[in-house]
Amino acid sequence: MKPSLFQPTEEMLRRNPLIKPGGVKMIKRMREHPDAPRWNHEAGDRVGREDLKALKAFEARLRTGRARRKPGAPPPEIIQMVNALRPRVLSFSERVPSGLGMEGEWEKIATMSREDVRIGVEKLVPLDADLDQLIVYKTAGTTGHPLLVPHHPRAAACYQPMLTFALGKYGIRPRFRRGMVACMLVCAQAQTVAYPTVLSFWNGAGFAKININPSEWPTPESPHRYFKEFSPFFLTGDPISFSEMMKMKIPVKPAALVTTAVALSTGLKKRLEKTYRCPVIDWYSLTETGPIGYACPKGHGYHVLPHDLYVEAVDEEGRQVKARERGEITVTGGRNPFLPLLRYRTGDWGRLDFGRCPCGDSMPRILDLEGRAPVLFRAPGGSIINPVDVSRVLREFPLVQHEFRQKADLSCELEVRPIAGPDSVDSGKVIRELKNLFGPELKVKVRIKPRLGDRRRGGKTIPYQSDLLLEE
């Protein structure tokens, strides 16, 4: 076919400003393949020439900015960032008293949490922010109701140099180019956004977010043929999705698997490594913070990955715990211009080690990370149901908190705390929507509990629990 047939349209250039005819051809090939899954979205990196320069500079700083850090006050560049943002970010000006000496009084700054993003995001966006490039991400909802997180294309694209850096630490040095698929993000959900695109930072190589739910494919054999045809260089996904991929025996030979979103068990990690004969790199990341750490190649915890993020372990009062003592992982900094973070409590716990690591990376390590445990649900018919799918159903109702549990016999129980009174939530409608997701055979009880969480420390609930075990 003539190259002119692959000239990008105006809409393509809006989504992918640097796309070339080869990129158009790649997207068309992925999208129109006879075994392609059901696509329901179109997306691009929105990266322009200035963004690409900034991404390459960020990649260089990932290598050169890895100086050893000490417990106590943050490095000077973090203090400079906070000082620069204080008059422009309402939340910062409220938290940092005038005249506070941050080098010696850092712990006097009040911490922030997920709740600040949920109900007061307008206090976090700088007053002078240029909103022309604003995009909004919705968190997966693995810890409860999803958050709406303001984001920027350049900040989102920084994931790519960080992924490349982590791959390099495992001896993998990819040479991405047009015409190849660099990465596929594997999901196993009842419904999720799915699309193919190309990424400018990776030289126009292909990328796809794919749902391996069998109902999303033309035939039972289609995912096997599709993965074999496009042979992605590496894969990303959560442990639940990789476990399901392994169960489906999809023939793929990735250079690495990068797991994220929920905790990866040692048993599943070993089985994935044996099955796919490649490194399994556990990745600690939140939508609000971006990537925080990657698993040390020598097995010594998680190295803090980005140089522009300051990580603490703090107690309930916001005081730093001693090195190697357990505390809540709390972060400051990042590169999202629409969501600067100041002592943001992640809700995850671990111990910080500032000592030298045998792998050679000088950045601090998070030891014994207590992240989000993987939770698996099954429909009565046997299909997998991801907690994200349940979140998508429940977010349509006026709820403050919820606890959803599936028993070993596949029956379910849901307790909810409504925003208003007990009559503000229609239990019958909740049951109908859950049956639409799980199937009409689902046995489920819904209980309205206006004081759910009140008797627990911090008012926290456990949104998802399951008596089913993730296959390892």
Describe the role of every protein-language-model region:
Residues 2-5, 188-307, 389:
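Conserved adenylate-forming
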Residues 143, 315-317, 381, 458:
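Residue-level recognition of short loop/turn positions
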Residues 167-190, 194-196:
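Carboxylate/His-rich catalytic cores and anion/metal-binding grooves
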Residues 235, 335-442:
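AMP-binding/adenylate-forming catalytic core of the ANL superfamily
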